[in-house]
Amino acid sequence: MTFFKKTLLILSLGIVSLAAAQKVDTKAKNILDETSANYKSKSTMYFKFVYGMGSNGKVSKNQTGIFYASKNKYKLKIMGNEQIFDGSKVYNINAEDMEVTIAKPNGSEAMLSPINYLDSYKKDYNISYTGNKNKLEVIKLTPTKKNGIKHVFLHINKAKKQIEKIEQYADNNDVTTISISQYKENLKVDSSTFSFNKNLYKNYLITEL
């Protein structure tokens, strides 16, 4: 489900540790390393966010979503759809179509985990510090190879070591954004949050790939 991939791609950019082989701005690297260490130290994380999308560099549509994560497991809910990764399989649940698709994660799906996805930036992106905007430090990520993305801007609260906003601009001038409206950490989250209960979807078409 491409929508979920794009959403998590930009949702979790704060958890990153970059390697010296890239063109790395020292100030940007230090900010990202501190943010990375902060997120990785948490047992669980909860984000409520506004996902924006549009074209020609302007956001024209917004949707609210929530995201739970515990180490390499997560649950995403947005637009009446749900995606669960239990550490082994990815479950895509489409309420409107009453369909569930179950699959082993491929390379891109495995990287949907906040930590695992962002570790890909070790080899795929150059980073630079662009300044302070609205009291947030802004880091620019530019892909080292063509991947459809022109650049990504991370807006980071340096004091809290947290991402507050992410802007992704594509080569075709499409724009997607994530604005974090609520963040909680180390919550007591029931383990069932990250598991798929087949009994709850008896009337759904369930396909395992």
How should each PLM-predicted stretch be described?
Residues 2, 18-59, 72, 146, ...:
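N-terminal leader/targeting segments and the immediate start of mature chains
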Residues 64-111, 171, 176:
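An acidic-aromatic
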Residues 1-8:
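Bacterial N-terminal signal peptides that target proteins for export
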Residues 134-209:
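Gly/Pro-enriched, hydrophobic low-complexity segments
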Residues 105-134:
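Flexible, surface-exposed loop/linker segments and immediately adjacent secondary-structure boundaries
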